[in-house]
Regions:
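Nucleotidyltransferase catalytic core that binds NTPs
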Residues: 1-129
Length: 129
């Protein structure tokens, strides 16, 4: 499994099938989402990709919150690899990044940055604010 920090040209990946999140705890819903991403990527001879953020957005948006995690970064990566994920992309979460509109995020990150062809997200996912 490839681990990337930051965006790389989208031409370097075939048919990117992407999910976005922090995946703390890796519960049944996370597994189902990862399974769908992997199955779609395999069907399309593409890349199963997890897009995640470092630091966690809450650490930037609400630094007063004492955020605790269920899984370590190493445990998350091991679970992604066991699920069949091909690549994990870590993006630095900053106040400037948080200020991107949903349209800017879709264009700059999803389309231009990682070449997303299909995107799968969980039930409570929201783009931007």
């Amino acid at each position: 499994m490839k681990i990337s920090r930051g965006l790389t040209p989208s031409t370097s990946r075939p048919y990117s099938v992407v999910t976005i999140g922090n995946f703390d705890g890796h519960h049944h819903g996370h597994r189902a989402l990862l399974d769908r991403v992997v199955a779609t990527a395999r069907r399309e001879a593409g890349t199963a990709l997890v897009l995640t953020f470092d630091p966690h957005p809450v650490k930037i948006l609400a630094p007063q919150v004492n955020l605790m995690f269920l899984t370590t970064p190493e445990e998350k990566l091991a679970r992604f690899e066991a699920a069949g994920i091909d690549e994990v992309v870590f993006l630095e979460f900053t106040t400037a990044f948080a200020a991107l509109s949903p349209a800017q995020f879709a264009k700059q990150v999803l389309c231009d940055g990682i070449g997303t062809r299909e995107l799968y997200v969980g039930e409570h996912f929201a783009f931007g604010k």
